[in-house]
C-alpha cells in the first residue's frame, strides 16, 4: 500500500468514526484532554508516556494567578447567572480507540472558557478555539464564549470594573470576550491530530514538536532542549 492509499484509508476511518463519540465507559481508550486540542503533539505525547512535568518558575506564578482568576470570575458567573463550574465532560470514540476529557470552566446551555493572560490577544488563540470547540461538540451548542482576563495579583481589582449588562458579551478594562460558533471542520482536525498522536504513542516514537517561542512555557522543555536527556 502506497502513502496516498494509506492516507486515504486513514481519512475514511476518521470520517466514519467521527460520529461514534458516545458516553459508554471503556477503560482501554487512550485519554486525551480538551485543553490539548491542536497544541504541540510532542507535549501531548510526553504526557501520555508519563514523563515528569517540570514547570519553569515564572510559569508557575502565572498558573497560580490564572487559577485565582478562574475562581473569582467563576463565582460571579455562578452567583449572578446560575452557571455550573468545572463541568466534567467526556467524548468517546471506541472505533478510534480514544476519548477526550475536559472541564468546562462555566456551563449553562453553552460553555464559557476563561483564560488568564499577561496581555490580551486581538483574536482568540487557535488552540483555545479548538478546546472550546470540543465543549461545543459535547454540549451541542451553536455558540460558546472565550473570556480573556489580564492576569493580576489581585484579580478582584480587574473584575470589579467589568460590565455584565450585555452578558454573555462582557466588556471591561483588562478583559476581552469572544463569541465563537461551533466549527465541524476544526473538530475533525482535532480528532485527526489526537489519532495521529495515538499512533506515535503506540509505536513509541515522539512526533515532531512545534519548536517555537511557546516551548519555553512547556513543562517538557527540559526533554527537548536539555543536555541531560536523549530521545
Task: Locate predicted features.
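A structural signal for short, well-ordered beta-strand segments and their strand-loop junctions
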Residues: 84, 107, 111-113, 143-148, ...
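A short beta-strand motif that forms part of the nucleic acid-binding face
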Residues: 115-118, 150-151
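Metal-dependent nuclease catalytic cores in nucleic-acid-processing enzymes
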Residues: 71-79, 123-152
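A residue-level signal for conserved active-site and pocket-lining positions in enzyme catalytic cores
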Residues: 40, 135, 218
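Residue-level detector of short, conserved catalytic/binding motifs and their immediate flanks
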Residues: 104, 133, 216
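Short, well-structured alpha-helical patches and their helix-loop capping segments
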Residues: 98, 123-127, 182, 186
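Metal-dependent nuclease catalytic regions and adjoining charged, substrate-binding loops involved
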Residues: 2-5, 141-231
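Metal-dependent nuclease catalytic cores that hydrolyze phosphodiester bonds in DNA/RNA
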Residues: 1-111, 118-120, 124
